[in-house]
C-alpha cells in the first residue's frame, strides 16, 4: 500500500523543555479511501534519575467524506505503552487518527516527525489492542495484535529549532511477538527432537525367567524347588532299589535313616520313591513286568477271604422232640 504524508512545521517551546505540534495528512491511493487528518502534539521535559517513558495513543475515527469500499470499517481503539527510556527526556504524548481497512490487507505505515530533542533509545515493543466487535458487511473484528518497533535516533542538545527523528513501524500481519517466537518454536517442535527412539531402560534388561541353580547342603544339594536334577551314584541307586523291593512306602523314621546312610536329604529320598512307584505302575500297565509278589499275595488273601465268606450247603434241621401235653383229669 502506498501512502503519501504531508507534514507542517513545528513550533518551538521554552528553555526548560522543547515541545511542538504538527498536523499530518495522509493519502491512501491504493485502497480508494478518503483522506484523514491527525494532529500531533509532542512535549519533552528535562528530568533526572531513572524514569519511565509513557506513550499514550488515542484515536478517534473521522467521518469520511466519500463512501468506503465494501468490507472496510472503522472502530475506535486505545493503545497504552510503558517502557524504560533514557533519563534525558520526560513524558511524550501524541494523538493520531487512523482507519481500519478491509480484511486480509496488510497495513504498513511510516511516520516521521521533526527532531525536537536528544532521544537515545532503540527497543522492541509488542502490544495488544482489544477492540470492540463490529458487525458490518457480514464481518466481525475480534482481538487485533499490533507488534511494532520504536526507533529513536540520538541527537545533541540545541535550540528549540532542533528536530527529533521518530520512526514507528507497525505490522499487523505477524500473529506472534518476536519475544514469543522462540517459546512457540520450542513448544511446537516435533516429538522426534525429544526422547530418541529405541532407548532401552533398566526394566527392559531384566530377564523374566532366569535359570535357578541348586545350593549344596549338608547332604548333597539343598531340597529347594526348581533345583537341578540330582545325579545319584550307583551305590545310592542300589540301596534305594533294595529298600523299594521290600517297602514301597517309607515311614518318616525310615526315610530319615536311609537319607543319613546314603548322604542324601529327606526330600531327595521321598521324591525318588514317588518317581519309582509311578515307573512301576506304568510298566505293569504296559504288561512289561509281572505283578509283584506282594500283589499276588494280596490276591490270594482276597480269594481266601471270599471263600470263607461264601455260604455253606444248607444242613437238614434235626427233628425237634415233641412234648406231649398232659391232660389233667
UniProtKB/Swiss-Prot annotation:
Motif residue range(s): Antp-type hexapeptide: 200-205
Biased composition (Basic and acidic residues): 283-308
Keyword Disulfide bond in annotation: no
SUPFAM superfamilies for this protein: Homeodomain-like
GO molecular function: DNA-binding transcription factor activity, RNA polymerase II-specific; RNA polymerase II cis-regulatory region sequence-specific DNA binding
Keywords (A to Z) from UniProt: Developmental protein, DNA-binding, Homeobox, Nucleus, Transcription, Transcription regulation
Subcellular location: Nucleus
Pfam families from the UniProt entry: Homeodomain
GO-annotated biological processes: regulation of transcription by RNA polymerase II; ventriculo bulbo valve morphogenesis
Domain of life of the organism encoding this protein: Eukaryota
PROSITE patterns: HOMEOBOX_1, HOMEOBOX_2
Region (Disordered), start-end ranges: 208-227, 277-329
Stored CDD domains: homeodomain
UniProt keyword annotation of Ion transport present: no
Major subcellular site: nucleus
Start-end of DNA-binding region: 225-284
GO cellular component terms, semicolon-separated: nucleus
Family: Belongs to the Antp homeobox family. Labial subfamily.
Function: Sequence-specific transcription factor. Part of a developmental regulatory system that provides cells with specific positional identities on the anterior-posterior axis.
Protein name (Swiss-Prot/TrEMBL): Homeobox protein Hox-A1a
Organism for this UniProt entry: Danio rerio (Zebrafish)
